[in-house]
Amino acid sequence: MFTLKLFVYTVVIFFVSLFIFGFLSNDPRRNPGREE
């Protein structure tokens, strides 16, 4: 059970890192076509 929980936490952290990286890469301030 501990290995399964560790695997789940690893996958969650991995996807969160991808989400944060994608959000920073797609910063609205870097997109000239989007003004807010």
From Swiss-Prot:
Tell me, what's a Pfam family for it? PsbI
Q: What processes in GO biological process is this protein linked to?
A: photosynthesis
* Origin: domain of life: Eukaryota
List localization entries. Plastid membrane
Could you give the subunit structure recorded for this chain?
PSII is composed of 1 copy each of membrane proteins PsbA, PsbB, PsbC, PsbD, PsbE, PsbF, PsbH, PsbI, PsbJ, PsbK, PsbL, PsbM, PsbT, PsbX, PsbY, PsbZ, Psb30/Ycf12, at least 3 peripheral proteins of the oxygen-evolving complex and a large number of cofactors. It forms dimeric complexes.
PANTHER family, per database record: PHOTOSYSTEM II REACTION CENTER PROTEIN I
Q: What is this protein called?
A: Photosystem II reaction center protein I
Question: What species is this protein from?
Answer: Cuscuta reflexa (Southern Asian dodder)
